[in-house]
């Protein structure tokens, strides 16, 4: 889900959004012993704008199917990756804590939506002994609106892991 060699590694969607990217490339590449380092068969544009991570993954899945058809029909020759390699590290559940200091509303919105998919620890903020988990965010009329699930801090930490 990155324009390799930029973005090799883990949590590509989250690492792209947290760095301010608004679009990326879906890349079909040959598997090698080194992660995401193989030659590239094709790349296709994928918007990261709006919507939750889940919605972006659905769009990426549909685009992947189109790419598979093209790979089978066109049999492109793979091309060696060129350019500076940038590695992404898989995000940890602790990195899902919303760092609200010095964040714009758009950054808060992006942070919540980039984690809003099954299997990902939701964006959260701990206040006192309460853990607030955010999902289904929207940026409207100068504010971020989101669903919030409130639990006692530490009681449901493995719910989305």
Predicted region positions:
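Donor/substrate-binding cores of folate-linked one-carbon enzymes
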Residues: 1-87, 94-97
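Short low-complexity stretches enriched in small and charged residues
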Residues: 88-92, 103-105
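An anion-binding loop in the catalytic cleft
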Residues: 99-161
